[in-house]
Each structure stands twice: as C-alpha cells, then as structure tokens.
Amino acid sequence: MGRRSALALAVVSALLCQVWSSGVFELKLQEFVNKKGLLGNRNCCRGGSGPPCACRTFFRVCLKHYQASVSPEPPCTYGSAVTPVLGVDSFSLPDGAGIDPAFSNPIRFPFGFTWPGTFSLIIEALHTDSPDDLATENPERLISRLTTQRHLTVGEEWSQDLHSSGRTDLRYSYRFVCDEHYYGEGCSVFCRPRDDAFGHFTCGDRGEKMCDPGWKGQYCTDPICLPGCDDQHGYCDKPGECKCRVGWQGRYCDECIRYPGCLHGTCQQPWQCNCQEGWGGLFCNQDLNYCTHHKPCRNGATCTNTGQGSYTCSCRPGYTGANCELEVDECAPSPCKNGASCTDLEDSFSCTCPPGFYGKVCELSAMTCADGPCFNGGRCSDNPDGGYTCHCPLGFSGFNCEKKMDLCGSSPCSNGAKCVDLGNSYLCRCQAGFSGRYCEDNVDDCASSPCANGGTCRDSVNDFSCTCPPGYTGKNCSAPVSRCEHAPCHNGATCHQRGQRYMCECAQGYGGPNCQFLLPEPPPGPMVVDLSERHMESQGGPFPWVAVCAGVVLVLLLLLGCAAVVVCVRLKLQKHQPPPEPCGGETETMNNLANCQREKDVSVSIIGATQIKNTNKKADFHGDHGAEKSSFKVRYPTVDYNLVRDLKGDEATVRDTHSKRDTKCQSQSSAGEEKIAPTLRGGEIPDRKRPESVYSTSKDTKYQSVYVLSAEKDECVIATEV
C-alpha cells in the first residue's frame, strides 16, 4: 500500500512539473530481449504460476545530471520512474499506452529549468513474482542495468541506442523537446502569442516576438499611428489613428490652435494670435488697412483709411451714402415746375415742359391771366417777370388748380377718429371719450364727479375708476361694504346686516357680541345679540343696563348659595364634636382663661419669627388629642403662626399626663412654683437648675417670638406675646 502511495505521489509530482516545465525529456523503451530468462546473478527467475525461468520484467529509470562515472544510486536529480510489469523475458513495447493504463510510452521527465544539454541515464530491468510488488531495493531482482551519459541538443528527432550485456539486449530512443510556448537551445525563451492589452504578437521559431500589423515595441503594445502623425503633438490608442494633444489640431496634429477669438492671426505655438499684415488688436480684428482689404467705396469713390478699422469714402457727384452706394435722385425735390416731367441724369436732371412753358425748370410761362388758365375757381395773378400764378381754392391743387385734393389723405384726425371729406373741408368723427376739431382731446369723465361718498376719481379713455373710502365699494362707491363679508360671527352663528351694523344670531350654547363665548347653561332658543357700537365700528344706541343688572343679580345669587353651603357644613361639624369638659369648679382665671384651659395644649415648640408664615389672616391654633380632651383656640388677628410641625410625635405623652394635670389644676394655687421639664423640643437643657432657660427668646428683630412650653410642664402656664 505504501508503494502505491509513493507511485501516486510521483505521478502527481510529475504532472505538476509538467504544468510549470519549460521542456520534457522523453525516453521510449522499444524492445527488451532476455534469451535465457535469467537474472543478473545467472539464477533462474522463479515464482508465480508461469513456466520455469520466466522473468516478469519491469523497469526502473533514473535520470540525473551528467556524471563522468555514473552511479546508479539515488538521488535522481532530473527524475525517476518505475514501470509496471511490461512483459516476460523478451518483448517489444509499442508507442502510446500499453496493456497497463498506468504506463505510457515514451516516459516523460518534465523540466522546470533550462535544459543543460547533458544527462546521465540509468535503466534497470527487474523481475517480480507479483505485479503488485514493484520494489527496486532488492538486488536479487536485478536482470540487467544500463548506465550511460550523453550530450543532447533540443530537437524533435529521436536518438536511437542499443544496450547489450551479453544475455540481454535493450533497444531504446530518447530526445528533449521544448514545452509549448518555450523556445531556444535550453527551452529558456518563453513566448506565448497574444492579442490583448498586454501585447499583440506571435512567436517565431526561436521564440522571438513578432508584432502583429499596426503594433510595435518590445511587447508589441505600442500602436503604429497614422503615417504622418506628428510624433510630439499626436498620439494613438489603436493602429492607423492620430489623436491630437491639447492645443493642436489637424489630420496630422501639426496645426496649433490659435487664441480663442483670433480672426486674422496665426500661431507657432498653441494659444497665440500673431496678427497678419494690416491687422491689429488683441484678436487681430482691427483692420489697419481697411480700404485695401475690403474696398468698401463704390461708384468710383475714393477710400481713405482713418484709423483701426475705419475709413471714409469721397463720393463722385451724383452719389451719396457711407460707401457712395446710393445714386442721388436730382428729381426727388421736384425741381421742375408747372407740371413739367423730370428726368434724372447721372449728375443732373432734365425738365420736359408742358405747352406754354419754358425755362430750365419750366418756370416761365408763355400764357397770361387773360388766357384764363386757372381751373376750379382758381384766382389768377400775373407775375412781374412773366407768366402767372393760380391761387387754388380749398380742396384743389396744381399749377392750374386742376387737381382735386384728398383732404383726408394726410390723416388729420387723431385717436382713431374717422375723417369725412366734405369737398371744401373735412370733418373728424371722434371715438367715444375724445373731442376737439381733430379728436385730440380726451374727455374728462371725472368732470361730473361720479364717485360718491368721498371716493377719488381717476379718468381714463371713455371711462373712469373710483378709489372708495373704507366702508364703501362698487363702481361709484355707492354701495356700502357688507359688515358680514368678513364673517365676524363665530361658532356657526348667522350674520345679519342692519344698515351700517351687523347682528350675530348665535347657535344654541354660545353667546357674546360675535358668539365667541360658550355659555354654561344655554338658553332654550336662539340668542340674537345686537352688537354695541364698539363692535359695530360706529357710535350710538342706549347702554345695556338690563344685561348688566341681570349679570350682577346672578353673581349675588351664586355667592349667597355658596355661603349657605359653607354654613351648613360648619353646623354639621360642630354637632359631631364632643362637649368640652368642665373645669371642675376652677374659678381662677388668667387672660380670660381658666387654669384647666391654660394647662391644656402647652406642648408646642419654640418657633422663631423667621419660621412663621405671615399671611395677614387670623391664626387658628387647634389641638385635638382625643375625645376625652377639650380644645381651645388662640387667635392672633394678623399673623398665621404655623405650628403644626412635628406635633404628632408628642400626642402619646400628652395623653399619659392629661389626668394628672387636671388634678393639679384643681389643687394648685396661683402663686405655685414652676417646675422645669428636663427637656424641651427646641433643644436639650442639661442644667435643670436654670428655669429661665425654658423660656427662650428669638433673636429675630422683625417679629416677636412665640414662647413654646414642653408637654411635660407641670404648672398651668400659658405663653403669650407682650
């Protein structure tokens, strides 16, 4: 099992070597002859089920570097191989795969380095009893051994050889061929044809790169540009094109780009504008020799350059215009008189006079007023120099008043008025809003003061507009603005216009001038509220005394009801209170209080004036320590002395000593001695011999202090403010 694993590992190694190899040494075993079937030690091959001396032959091949004295021992530096059993005694081996699919003839030894040109070869023929046992370490299995060293050049041709040892003959052949894409004497030149971004080439016989048409460079990655493309200013990404770099243009990128806007200039480098002769300025757009370049003057006029891009033309007689392009029409001012016809000449004019007239402009007449030349009632007068003049009546013209005039032809009427020709005069029928002889005046539509209620009138064509004061609207400001227009009533109320006022008809449950208040008890029907003048934006009307009185009565009734409820509650509370205990016939009083009353409720703390809340109300000091104990109140009319703090903790002590105090109150005289309690709530008093320390005073100067006695005080003493 271990040998099979070793064989599989060797095959995988050989395959990996083939992947990365540059060439392959190939050994072809052709024929092996073992005439007597003997081993190398002349013993007969035994074992197995075949005939005696039948040697089941397999081969071990070892390829190593060139050695002058070849050693058959490992390592096989170039590779080794062990074949399966290929035959018995004498046999021939065909090319390709044999009986055993694990063997292929020739045996291949891939190389991952340059072929050195020399090698040493060891071929051992071995015998095995079992096809599964292909161990080569046992020398007893050896049939024959071939050791040789050779020089070998790379090529496709096989080198034939025959090894004879006397008892055995081995005929074999070998060669070294380069792997695909490898070339050269040692298969060290790598060349793989490609046509992509990394190259465009094929490979020659010796592995040289032969660029595809249109490509050049060491790896054929540089395209050959269009023939004539400038080497510096042009480039290409693929063969046959010529792309220009920035600032250059043209088919071959040999033309510089001029400065933008340059008209009559050239450049030697990009963005230049070198003006041509006769041109100036930043953009070479100012013609310094306009007359020569443009020849603007026509009709034989003389051109004179007057500056950059300017000129003047001196026209010949009979021509005018900036470039003398206009021929002067000498007949334009109608120089011919008396109905003569004018003919324009190149530099003058000619008048063709009607019968009876002569002169350059036919100004002279051969007729007189005696001949009656004037028509249509024209008045004739003789001229001192000869001839006559006809004074035409209105509506006629011409030298002899022979032409009837169109009085409306000159459009004398303005502002779209229609002109009516009356023969001797005309009449303008004006459009609405205009007046005057020629309808030139706009009729003042505000003259009649159409705007009412102090509105301002603005006149327009056959119309007017009024700017109304607040409270009015309409064409003439005659319509008052509706007070309900802006929806003053709230909560679904209905607005009613009442002249200059409005009224809100409130929905059930709402009230107020604008129905903005929610009523606690809505009236049974809808409420109509007449707004006061403060809400109506106008003054006038009586003050609503009835509503005010009704409101006051409602408030008083409410207060009386509350007072009655309070009195009832207090009466019920007094009924549930226990009756006060009698003082046992004690008649001695102090500050209108009996001794028993003074004895009770003396267990209070000393509180400074700064700790008393002044509320300007009557203070109610009430102590309730049980049903068996009566209560009393000390009233201070202006100060509320809050003495509730920490009184509950002393209730038990007060209950225990209550009966003892009552007895004491009855037997004690008014001049009895005071016994000081050992402790006070205001603080500990370590010395019992200082009775005056029981009554402490506050240092507060704003208010007087309340003297507080301990609950354990024996005498019936009450503290008060003096």
Curated annotation (Swiss-Prot):
Effect caused by changing S693A: Not phosphorylated. Not phosphorylated and prevents phosphorylation at S-696. Reduces NOTCH1 transactivation. Reduces cell surface levels of proteins. Increases ectodomain shedding
Knockout consequences: Heterozygous Dll1 mice mutants are lighter and smaller, with altered fat to lean ratio and have increased blood pressure and a slight bradycardia. The animals have reduced cholesterol and triglyceride levels in blood. Heterozygous Dll1 mice mutants and hypomorphic Dll1 mice mutants survive until birth, despite significantly reduced Notch activity. Conditional knockout in inner ear leads to an early and excessive production of hair cells and have vestibular defects.
Sequence ranges on the Extracellular membrane side: 18-545
Domain EGF-like: 225-253, 256-284, 291-324, 331-362, 369-401, 408-439, 446-477, 484-515
Cross-linked residues, Glycyl lysine isopeptide (Lys-Gly) (interchain with G-Cter in ubiquitin): K613
Cytoplasmic topological intervals: 569-722
Pfam families, per database record: DSL, EGF, EGF_DL_JAG, MNNL
Transmembrane segments: 546-568
Induction profile: Induced by PTF1A in multipotent pancreatic progenitor cells. Induced by CDX1 and CDX2 during somitogenesis and goblet cell differentiation.
Compartments where located: Apical cell membrane; Cell junction, Adherens junction; Membrane raft
Phosphothreonine PTM sites in chain numbering: T638
Gene Ontology MF terms: calcium ion binding; Notch binding; receptor ligand activity; scaffold protein binding; Tat protein binding
Gene Ontology BP terms: animal organ morphogenesis; astrocyte development; auditory receptor cell fate commitment; cell-cell signaling; cerebellar molecular layer formation; cerebellar Purkinje cell layer structural organization; clathrin-dependent endocytosis; compartment pattern specification
Modifications after synthesis and translation: Ubiquitinated by MIB (MIB1 or MIB2), leading to its endocytosis and subsequent degradation. Ubiquitinated; promotes recycling back to the plasma membrane and confers a strong affinity for NOTCH1. Multi-ubiquitination of Lys-613 by MIB1 promotes both cis and trans-interaction with NOTCH1, as well as activation of Notch signaling. Ubiquitinated by NEURL1B.
Effect of K689R: Decreases Notch signaling pathway
Bilayer topology annotation: Single-pass type I membrane protein
Residues linked to a glycan: N476
Record domain DSL: where: 176-220
Tissue: In the embryo, expressed in the paraxial mesoderm and nervous system. Expressed at high levels in adult heart and at lower levels, in adult lung. Highly expressed in satellite cells from masseter and tongue than in satellite cells from leg and extraocular muscle.?.
Source superkingdom: Eukaryota
Role of this protein: Transmembrane ligand protein of NOTCH1, NOTCH2 and NOTCH3 receptors that binds the extracellular domain (ECD) of Notch receptor in a cis and trans fashion manner. Following transinteraction, ligand cells produce mechanical force that depends of a clathrin-mediated endocytosis, requiring ligand ubiquitination, EPN1 interaction, and actin polymerisation; these events promote Notch receptor extracellular domain (NECD) transendocytosis and triggers Notch signaling through induction of cleavage, hyperphosphorylation, and nuclear accumulation of the intracellular domain of Notch receptors (NICD).
Identification of the protein by name: Delta-like protein 1
